[in-house]
Amino acid sequence: MDLTPTLDAIRVFCEERDWRQFHNPKDLTAALSIEVAELMECFLWKKADELTLTIEQNRSNIEAEIADIAIYLFHLVEVLQIDLPAAIDHKLEHNRKKYPIEKSRGNAKKYTDL
C-alpha cells in the first residue's frame, strides 16, 4: 500500500487553506480523539449480533470517520516528524516480547495476565 499520493493530497489540502499554523500536537491529538469518539458512536449500544447490519447500514459514515482519523493521525506524524513505518516496526517488536505466541495465541488477556 503506497500512501505517498494520499499523504501528498492531505498536505496540499492543508497548505492551500493555510491550516498548518493550527496543527500543533495538542490540537491534533484532541481532534484525533474526537474523531475516534465519533467512530465509536457508530457502534454505541449495539449488541454483537447487530454489528454486521450496523456496519452495512452505516458504511459510508464509518468510512468517513476512519478517513478523518487517518488524516489527523498523518498530520500528527508529520508535525512530530515520526518515521511511522519504523515506529510501527519498533512497537511490533516490543509487543512480540510482551505477547509471546505460545502464551497469547487465541487469548485476549492483557500481557500482565498471561
Predicted regions and their residues:
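Flexible "arm" and connector segments at domain edges
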Residues: M1-I66, A70-L114
